[in-house]
A protein has these predicted regions:
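A short, flexible loop at the N-terminus of ABC-type nucleotide-binding domains that lies
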Residues: 24-31, 39-53, 103
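Conserved ABC transporter NBD signature motif
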Residues: 90-101, 106
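Conserved ABC ATPase "signature" region
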Residues: 130, 134, 141-159
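Catalytic Walker B motif of ABC-type/P-loop ATPase nucleotide-binding domains
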Residues: 188-191
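ABC transporter nucleotide-binding domain
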Residues: 207-301
Length: 352
């Protein structure tokens, strides 16, 4: 059993009373609150600032993605919030409990699925889940019932008697998530949950995660460098780079506010393209205009309405477009706008 998942809380009666208190809490405060959270590491004679003053709130029931390249500070932030790392400075509360002063209560309030496989290779799948329940202070009977529930929820029932070492990568990740949910935590951290999985396995895993969230109302915070994952799954995206939060909003708002739509228009002459560019520069929604021969490239908010106005006004001045295309922005465009770097290229460079 991996220490990533069993975080070392007490299994005493007091711990179980604390758990009852957690479950009875109202919605009077955020599920996660951090203030100026930092983490520094000594690397030889050099001091590495992995996390630099992260301040954020996550409401109960939210699904939030921490997006950034490898080495941005995402996993370090999660490890501090799960009490696996002590912050250098700053503070944080989980379900109202301080991560430094109430470690047992914090640990009972969350499930954590790390990047590595958390289950013991020689254990049988169902036995691993039962053992996890016992470590949380559950009775053997309750642990067995909960194990069977999770096996069914994550389509692992037929694999319950198999050794963990015989599972496929996707099956192991589903087991990891089951381990994180044994004690029905109100908060689940997923650290790069689909790294290394093929697209079909990733989609299957997300189907399970989203279904369980709908049924249980669990708050989920995940780290990922998969842009599509953050864009399509998360209700809110927090972009982290070099240990700092550089953007925080819905994916739709980030793309609209920071990147904008890309309009590409072609004309029958360079003169006509120049006329269209001149018109575009006068529109308040247009952010950038570039002309290359008879092609005009525009970055603009509200791309559809901008294009309609642009085509009408350019045509009135004798510049009729031959073609006009709109490309919607991606979260990589957002990262590029914020940092001058591509998130895909940054992630690939670190990985290599």
């Amino acid at each position: 059993m991996s220490p990533q998942l069993i975080l070392g809380w007490s299994t005493s009666d007091q711990s179980r009373r604390n758990w009852g208190h957690i479950m009875s809490r109202g919605n009077d405060r955020p599920m996660i609150e951090t203030k100026a959270l930092t983490k520094h590491f000594a690397q030889g004679k050099k001091l590495v600032e992995a996390v630099k003053g992260v301040t954020l709130d996550v409401a109960e029931g939210e699904l939030v993605a921490l997006l950034g390249p490898n080495g941005a500070g995402k996993s370090t932030t999660l490890r501090m919030l799960t009490t696996l790392l002590e912050p250098t400075s700053g503070s944080a509360r989980i379900a109202g409990f301080d991560i430094a002063a109430a470690r047992n209560e914090v640990r009972s309030s969350l499930g954590y699925v790390g990047q590595g496989n958390g289950a013991g290779h020689n254990q049988r799948v169902r036995d691993e889940l039962v053992t996890q329940g016992l470590c949380y202070g559950m009775s053997k009977g309750d642990s067995q019932v909960r194990a069977d529930e999770l096996l069914g929820d994550l389509e692992l029932t037929d694999l319950g008697t198999r050794k963990v070492s015989t599972l496929s990568g996707g099956q192991r990740r589903r087991l990891d998530i089951a381990l994180g949910l044994v004690h029905r935590p109100p908060l689940l951290f997923l650290d790069e949950p689909t790294t290394g999985m093929d697209p079909q396995s990733r989609a299957n895993l997300w189907d399970h995660i989203l279904r369980l969230r709908r049924e249980m109302g669990t708050t989920i915070v995940l780290t990922t460098h998969y842009l599509e994952e953050a864009d399509s799954m998360a209700e809110r995206v927090i972009v982290i780079d070099e240990g700092t939060v550089i953007a925080d909003n819905t994916a739709t708002a980030l793309k609209a506010d920071l990147a904008g739509d890309h309009l590409l228009l072609t004309f029958d002459s360079t003169d006509a393209a120049g006329v269209a560019a001149s018109v575009a520069e006068q529109l308040v929604t247009v952010r950038e205009v570039a002309v290359d021969a008879n092609v005009v490239s525009i970055r603009a908010g509200e791309g559809d309405s901008t294009l309609t106005v642009l085509l009408r006004q350019a045509d009135a001045r004798g510049a009729r477009a031959l073609t006009a295309d709109i490309t919607r922005p991606t979260l990589d465009d957002v990262f590029l706008t914020l940092t001058g770097r591509s998130l895909r290229e940054s992630a690939a460079a670190v990985a290599s």
